[in-house]
Amino acid sequence: DAIIRDIRGLLKSFKIKTYNEDTGYGLFRHVLIRTGYHSGQIMVVLVLGSPILPSKNNFVKALRKLHPEITTIVLNVNGQKTSMILGEKETVLYGKGYIEDELCGKTFRISSKSFYQVNPVQTEKLYGKAIELAGLTGKERVIDAYCGIGTIGLIASDKAKEVISVELNSDAVRDAIANAKRNGIKNVRFYNNDAGVFMHQMADAGESADVVFMD
């Protein structure tokens, strides 16, 4: 709340107009803040209708001075007249462009457009119970459908022979691949595809799996 409040103040100081949904005029559309529950890392995503932020460097400097706890700042461009919050193009204004957090003993990279569970404490319980009920013995071929940044598949990989993770969001797949490398996991493969289509293709090819996780 404090970060958003101060961004509002900076918009006035820098005379940056906010976006009007009805008219389509204005530059500043949204602010998205993501926080690592365990790491405490903070990502601020500024969503603009144009890639040009007036006095960009000074704006970022002023925001960082007010909130030195911010880990990274990303500029996202959404020039479409749409209810969708995020656009396709992004520029990293400060930091790495992503944050990291811990889940079930593994480290995960989270970028602005990647899905991550909003309640990590409950997520650990949920994933633990799902893996327990799956009864993995180390011999199974597992599908992680709609895998996002790879969380459940990477966590389950310790108890499976092979994990096939499928996700349509290409940004999330990039994070998932990085997460596998970050955690030294080599028995997981990632596919950038619709999970339903992918599983039909597997079936048509005569392939099968022992367990499917669907979140």
Q: Predicted regions: what is each one?
A:
Residues K17-Y25, V142:
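Short helix/loop segment immediately N-terminal to the Walker
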Residues T35, L48-S50, V77-G79:
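Non-catalytic surface loops within mature trypsin-like serine protease
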Residues D1-N20, I33, H38, L53:
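Extended interfacial segments that mediate partner engagement and assembly in macromolecular machines
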